Amino acid sequence: MARSLKKGPFVDDHLMKKVLKAKEEKNPKPIKTWSRRSTITPDMIGLTINVHNGRDFVPVYVTERHVGFKLGEFAPTRTFRGHKGSVQKKIGK
């Protein structure tokens, strides 16, 4: 279910402060965050945000196409290594 338009997008306050500070700097460093639930806003375009995936930080360079998505959508938490049986069947043939 989508979020109500009258509420606006959710962005953690501490992340928004870091974004505004980075926009003021001439050469901003990547922003490190654990806030996967925050929505990407137009203020974040052009910044690199390191999003935590549970183990390490995944760098996400924000472009116009990312606006409206959540930060967590670009930092997968699980690695798919394939189904066990399918590799053994290919080798056996």
UniProtKB/Swiss-Prot annotation:
Gene Ontology molecular function, alphabetical: rRNA binding; structural constituent of ribosome
Domain of life: Bacteria
RNA-binding listed as a keyword: yes
Keyword Transcription set for record: no
Alphabetical GO biological process terms: ribosomal small subunit assembly; translation
Cross-referenced SUPFAM superfamilies: Ribosomal protein S19
GO cellular component, as recorded: cytoplasm; small ribosomal subunit
Keywords: Ribonucleoprotein, Ribosomal protein, RNA-binding, rRNA-binding
UniProt-listed InterPro entries: Ribosomal_uS19 (IPR002222), Ribosomal_uS19_bac-type (IPR005732), Ribosomal_uS19_CS (IPR020934), Ribosomal_uS19_SF (IPR023575)
Family: Belongs to the universal ribosomal protein uS19 family.
Function, as annotated: Protein S19 forms a complex with S13 that binds strongly to the 16S ribosomal RNA.
Family matches, as NCBIfam families: rpsS_bact
Protein name according to UniProt: Small ribosomal subunit protein uS19
UniProt organism field: Nautilia profundicola (strain ATCC BAA-1463 / DSM 18972 / AmH)
Classification of source organism: Bacteria, Pseudomonadati, Campylobacterota, Epsilonproteobacteria, Nautiliales
